[in-house]
Amino acid sequence: MQKEPMSQFGYDKLAAELKDLKDNQRPAVVIEIDTARSHGDLKENAEYHAAREKQALIESRIVELSDLLARAQVIDPSSYEHDSVKFGSSVVIMDLDTEKESKYTLVGICEGDLDKGYISIASPIARAMLGKKEGDDFKVRLPKGESEFEILSINYEPLKF
């Protein structure tokens, strides 16, 4: 079973969503199904079919979240040195073609927020820079083609969700 690294915030966020699905949304959709069923013929009952579809989506998400939480590896990135790129590292990189600098922080798969510069540790660019040190170059295949980057700095900054 492959572990999924995430922060405590990410774990708590997923656990809260799972609790809401089980405690609120699942019982509510059962009531919706019962109400729709009481309206008669199920073959042509759009309300019933919509509620059943909603139930299937909720059950699917419950299974997905349960699996993810079972595989979660909660990591405190402040507890270790960031001398190389790891989960929780804030990394400044430079595109060697354009000389454009970008800053990214590597977070769990459910914590990405590009507006804040938080990228999933499972993303191609994050995977390519894992384990690299300041001054190292790395290549990554992006939608626009292969690009080469240099790591300018690595440090730890507390996550601000």
UniProtKB/Swiss-Prot annotation:
Acyltransferase keyword on record: no
Keyword Aminoacyl-tRNA synthetase: no
Listed GO MF terms: DNA binding; RNA polymerase binding
Signal peptide extent: none
Biological processes, Gene Ontology terms: DNA-templated transcription elongation; regulation of DNA-templated transcription elongation
Top-level division of the source organism's lineage: Bacteria
PANTHER family reported for this sequence: TRANSCRIPTION ELONGATION FACTOR GREA
Family the UniProt entry places it in: Belongs to the GreA/GreB family.
Main function: Necessary for efficient RNA polymerase transcription elongation past template-encoded arresting sites. The arresting sites in DNA have the property of trapping a certain fraction of elongating RNA polymerases that pass through, resulting in locked ternary complexes. Cleavage of the nascent transcript by cleavage factors such as GreA or GreB allows the resumption of elongation from the new 3'terminus. GreA releases sequences of 2 to 3 nucleotides.
Protein name, entry field: Transcription elongation factor GreA
Organism from which the protein derives: Campylobacter jejuni subsp. doylei (strain ATCC BAA-1458 / RM4099 / 269.97)
Lineage: Bacteria, Pseudomonadati, Campylobacterota, Epsilonproteobacteria, Campylobacterales
